[in-house]
């Protein structure tokens, strides 16, 4: 665009040419995510997607929106922007997956005060990587440059996912029964929740970004910025051969707030603490914050990022399949009859 046509807007703080430069940088990234349903290119007013409804008697669209939260503050602090895009995708696609939906497409929203093309391109590269992992298309997005709205060098992200499921195969927890087995799938790290506390504890620790995280051989930066695991391929594999009765994406509120969201009112979940491997980062956070394990399980995933609930007769086979898929997983609990005297539905045995 000729400079004189955008001069006044640039002087006001919005650089249209920078926005165009970003679009040029990310075109190939976006194209790398396209699936056969995409029938439009980047730059249109809306993204076009033609879903394949073959084999679905009663298709239902499933949608979700989410952000990355204050994990972004660490991205700014560490000047590391290439993984938060994966987090952004994971937070939405894992949510639609809980209902048994296959993610179809994703859209992102990037808002900042002054557009840093390099940082934004790194973010979008992560979004594209997340979409490839989730086997969904990055169909479009919005970049908003809003002077005076954000501190220099900072931005915010939001993501939107649409998936599809056959109505008869929607997973809603209604088939969960007493005796079913609760299987926890390992997390990659802290994922994207609890980072307001994580940041405070990191500052308290006195460690630098390049220092080694206690109990690991990785830097504090790499451990804290490890992206949220995307479970789409693994769960889609399980759903082909097993009856998955309920699923949980373990996000804000941990076990106590998320597992009850899929349980019928007639049952409780009993969790055996110690049945799974707790990652070193959670021991580090607990020690720094002088937190109890019940507090930790209310705030963080503590090493379990996703839960599936299956019948007892299928539990061993499901665990075997997960091992074959290189997905760490453990039988972490069972479904029991509801305790009528209590409002709680999750009980953790700390032994």
Curated annotation (Swiss-Prot):
It catalyses: 2-formamido-N(1)-(5-O-phospho-beta-D-ribosyl)acetamidine + ATP = 5-amino-1-(5-phospho-beta-D-ribosyl)imidazole + ADP + phosphate + H(+). It is found in: Cytoplasm. It is an enzyme of class 6 (ligase). Pathway: Purine metabolism; IMP biosynthesis via de novo pathway; 5-amino-1-(5-phospho-D-ribosyl)imidazole from N(2)-formyl-N(1)-(5-phospho-D-ribosyl)glycinamide: step 2/2. It comes from the Bacteria. The keyword tRNA-binding does not apply. Signal peptide: none annotated. Its main location: cytoplasm. GO terms for cellular component: cytosol. HAMAP family: AIRS (MF_00741). This is Phosphoribosylformylglycinamidine cyclo-ligase.
